A protein has these predicted regions:
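Hydrophobic transmembrane alpha-helices and immediately adjacent juxtamembrane helices
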Residues: 1-257
């Protein structure tokens, strides 16, 4: 069955809106959690790395949040995608639509949370005597689209495989924690010894974080990093959709697809 783009967009909006309402139902702070949660983590890491370990990085608060906020978008999307099909089982059983929209809606929801953190970045830029750049106007959409593609590729793989391998959740949690420390979020990439430089070279998440940091802190677009983000994102999406389509017959028997 073929679907037009208008229908898919409307469907994406409806599912994303539903997920937002479910998440913040009976929550006193509501959408403020989208800012409070990453900001709290930033305060903890600032205390540990700047005040205790005395990491010598200029404007460390801005440095930290420009890496941590985009990371939260990716990590939350990847983690929540594990149960995205299971959480939407009732909709899947009752409605005919492309099931791949479900993990995409989760990525978009976390992307909206990320957008809510950009004003926080702006405030800290002014606090440290820095200002937003005009390049943000086209730079934010450019990098954000790349991150959507990349994160969707990861999410469709996780959400599909988790229906068959429930232990995947534990491997994903460990993997995300490992990648967090292998990605220059808390530290600068030039602090890594040369013999370990491959950690940055072969880590597409590093390209993602450094793309955002260059834009927010310097007002520049690093097209090398952005190209890596898009390239790996497209590959992951193609692989993810291939896995999804190959397992669709099995998913149909489980009423999940």
């Amino acid at each position: 069955m073929k679907y037009n783009l208008g229908y898919l967009f409307d469907l994406l909006v409806v599912i994303t809106n539903k997920d937002l309402k479910v998440r913040y139902k009976s929550s006193m702070l509501g959408y403020l959690w989208s800012v409070a949660n990453p900001l709290l983590f930033a305060m903890i890491y600032y205390f540990i790395f700047k005040l205790v370990m005395r990491v010598q990085i200029p404007n460390y608060t801005v440095f930290l949040i420009t890496g941590l906020f985009p990371w939260q978008w990716f990590a939350s999307s990847a983690t929540n995608s594990l149960f995205s099909f299971i959480a939407n089982a009732q909709i899947i059983k009752k409605t005919v639509f492309p099931r791949s929209v479900i993990p995409l809606s989760n990525v978009m929801m976390e992307g909206l949370h990320f957008l809510c953190t950009i004003p926080v970045i702006v405030v800290f830029l002014f606090v440290y005597g820095m200002t937003p750049s005009l390049s943000w106007v086209w730079g934010i959409p450019l990098i954000a689209i790349g991150q959507v593609i990349f994160t969707f590729g990861v999410s469709i793989i996780f959400s599909t495989l988790n229906l068959f391998f429930r232990d995947l959740e534990r491997f994903v949690s460990l993997g995300i924690m490992l990648m967090f420390y292998c990605t220059p979020i808390l530290y600068a990439s030039d602090m890594i010894p040369e013999k370990f430089s491959w950690i940055i070279t072969y880590n597409p998440l590093a390209s993602m974080i450094l793309s955002w940091r260059d834009l927010f802190m310097n007002g520049t677009l690093n097209y090398e990093y952005i190209s890596i983000l898009y390239f790996t994102g497209i590959i992951l999406t193609v692989v993810g959709l291939s896995i999804f389509n190959k397992l669709k017959a099995l998913l149909n028997k489980s009423n999940f697809c």
